[in-house]
């Protein structure tokens, strides 16, 4: 019997949830995704200090003001890591724009264009890049503009069907619903000790998005993310993409128990689902009605924003040291 890792690959594309190139090459996955939290962890590791310093030197040479220099450096760090990761996976890498822009459509568009152009300028293949955009209304609008300009987007921090439908309407390439963070909210909100896989609210949310997309032949791909357990991963076997941490990937490789496909287009087509029409006002109202999605979206933006600020502080200190050496 083959491993659960190999069995899952029959139905789903497996994605490494790490920004560490050295770790990625050991995982055997097709794609990789990063976020500010993962990049911060990598940037703090001694083995990547030369990459960090190169990005800082490059940013300084662009002759911008202090704010522009930080922007240049942060995006260069991402691109450096992304290009290194792509040496070890055959598919795509997802790079994320600054979470502090989450409610500014035009700023997100401009930042994503800069990131994409920098990626290509440094030798990257644009077809192998997904730009991660937060699942706010403004973010989804930005993704729609970017897709029309040939920049593929991964709309992230998806916590309910409303966000997923809005992203599909915007014709984005891919959405990333967060299984584990949904699960965490329900545990915290209701004091439950846990949910069976059959009742897991995070698993159910992704399954609902999958069913809606496949029922109506929506081409936007689904990349389930933020898994807490191997059982959550297996419960979504058949989802287009599964973003899995290195720890859970290793568990899947060691287990040879049979895996059953849980999601399929054929089964989704049989479901009695009605299409939903969304305007901005309807989107905002339905998000307001969903306390979990509203709170987790806001929390996710805060976490990514906070980690970006920590990374900025580290970069600022490096820049100060370089300036002192050159004085």
Curated annotation (Swiss-Prot):
Any GO molecular function: transaldolase activity
Keywords: Cytoplasm, Pentose shunt, Schiff base, Transferase
PROSITE patterns: TRANSALDOLASE_1, TRANSALDOLASE_2
Alphabetized InterPro entries for the sequence: Aldolase_TIM (IPR013785), TAL/FSA (IPR001585), Transaldolase_1 (IPR004730), Transaldolase_AS (IPR018225)
Cross-referenced Gene3D superfamilies: Aldolase class I
Pathway(s) it belongs to: Carbohydrate degradation; pentose phosphate pathway; D-glyceraldehyde 3-phosphate and beta-D-fructose 6-phosphate from D-ribose 5-phosphate and D-xylulose 5-phosphate (non-oxidative stage): step 2/3
Active site: 132 (schiff-base intermediate with substrate)
Compartment(s) where it occurs, according to its Swiss-Prot or TrEMBL record: Cytoplasm
GO cellular component: cytoplasm
Pfam families per UniProt: TAL_FSA (PF00923)
Catalytic activity: D-sedoheptulose 7-phosphate + D-glyceraldehyde 3-phosphate = D-erythrose 4-phosphate + beta-D-fructose 6-phosphate
GO BP terms, alphabetized: carbohydrate metabolic process; pentose-phosphate shunt
Enzyme class: transferase
Function: Transaldolase is important for the balance of metabolites in the pentose-phosphate pathway.
PANTHER family recorded: TRANSALDOLASE
Family listed: Belongs to the transaldolase family. Type 1 subfamily.
HAMAP family for this protein: Transaldolase_1
Protein name: Transaldolase
Gene that produces this protein: tal
